Amino acid sequence: MSWIEPIISHFCQDLGVPTSSPLSPLIQLEMAQSGTLQLEQHGATLTLWLARSLAWHRCEDAMVKALTLTAAQKSGTLPLRAGWLGESQLVLFVSLDERSLTLPLLHQAFEQLLRLQQEVLAP
């Protein structure tokens, strides 16, 4: 068991999602309002991905807004990034160094992804 597993497990429980042990290196959570949250461990990094499908007519504006906000470092204190999957799925993500991972940092990263998503999707 990795030393960060209890942190990830506690984070998932805080979101109301029970976990089993041992944790998979890829955890996928369906969020009712914000799409799919994935937590992926790779090397010494934990990446949080927040993906949401959009209606075709919102894609171009959302893509430009997401890339502008993340490129301008207006996304908060963590290095948030934006991308696109397929034809209509907005993906916002942040990679965290496992050595500095704490439960508050994990919550902060998730909250910043949610805020960025709200900014991107705001009219």
Swiss-Prot record:
Membrane-topology annotation of the record: Peripheral membrane protein
Entry superkingdom: Bacteria
Keywords (A to Z) from UniProt: Cell inner membrane, Cell membrane, Chaperone, Cytoplasm, Membrane, Plasmid
UniProt cross-references to SUPFAM superfamilies, sorted A to Z: Type III secretory system chaperone-like (SSF69635)
CDD domains reported in the protein's UniProt record: T3SC_IA_SycN-like (cd17031)
GO BP terms, alphabetized: protein secretion
Main location: cytoplasm
Protein localization: Cytoplasm; Cell inner membrane
GO cellular component assignments: cytoplasm; plasma membrane
Pfam families with a match to the protein in the record: Type_III_SycN
Subunit structure: Interacts with YscB to form a complex which specifically binds to YopN.
Task of the protein: Functions as a specific chaperone for YopN. It could facilitate the secretion and the subsequent translocation of YopN.
Protein name, per record: Chaperone protein SycN
